[in-house]
Amino acid sequence: WNKFLQGYYDYSGISADSFDQAVQLNDQGKPVLTPAMKQQQIRLQTTVSPSVYYIGFNMLDPIVGGDSKRARDLRQAIAMTIDYEEYIALFMNGRGIAANSPIPPGIFGFQAGQAGINPTVYQWDGKQAQRRPLSAAQALMKQAGYVGGIDPATKKPLVIHYDVSSGGGADDKARFQWMRKQLAKLGIQLDIRSTQYNRFRDKVKTGQVQMFSWGWLADYPDPENF
């Protein structure tokens, strides 16, 4: 980014650390260049990345997996509780939207507005989607048998193992702490297991995970790629 500002490069992406220096949001919530960038005759080009990031569950796991109502209630409670709107604001400078389906904007089949919401996690207030309240997730936890997040088998907080691929940087640590706080709303204790990508991928493929974070960037712009 600094080399770009010095004129060495014709084009550059904007890192999270430099975002506020280069971009601000106008009254309509659209990204525009800051006055300092405009004075340097820099132009802003934006595009929608055909990518999705998600939390996955091992469906063979005895706690979070399977098609029993108990496991389904637990998964839905977790999905309701993780506030991705907050995550996008804190860690992505507002660049992104909370996913309601596997198909991202810009790909045929994506639906915006009321028709595209995930009714398990969101409700429509007449103008926009609103994440269901924490009380709804807590009610599902109770139905699943984890009142206040307590595991009836141990009489202690339910422990969920969360596998991620990480290089161990400061940004990753902040994200992990944020995720712990999300599940703590339900009384769940999150055990984060961070590994290098190759090891992480092998663990997912061989079912050595319980809950994990992954993503997908389209190889080509067609919904069947998702």
Where are these regions (language model features)?
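Structural transition elements
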Residues: 64-65, 97-144, 166-174
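Immediate post-signal peptide segment of exported/extracytoplasmic ligand-binding proteins
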Residues: 72, 134-161
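Periplasmic binding protein-like
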Residues: 28-32, 162, 181-226
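Solvent-exposed, polar/charged alpha-helical surfaces in well-ordered, non-transmembrane soluble domains
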Residues: 2, 6, 55, 72, ...
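Sec-exported extracytoplasmic/periplasmic mature domains
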Residues: 5, 9, 24-27, 62, ...
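Short, hydrophobic beta-strand segments
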Residues: 55-61, 155-166
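Extracellular/periplasmic solute-recognition and catalytic clefts
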Residues: 1-61, 85, 89-91, 98, ...
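Short helix-loop capping/hinge motifs at secondary-structure junctions, enriched
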Residues: 61-74
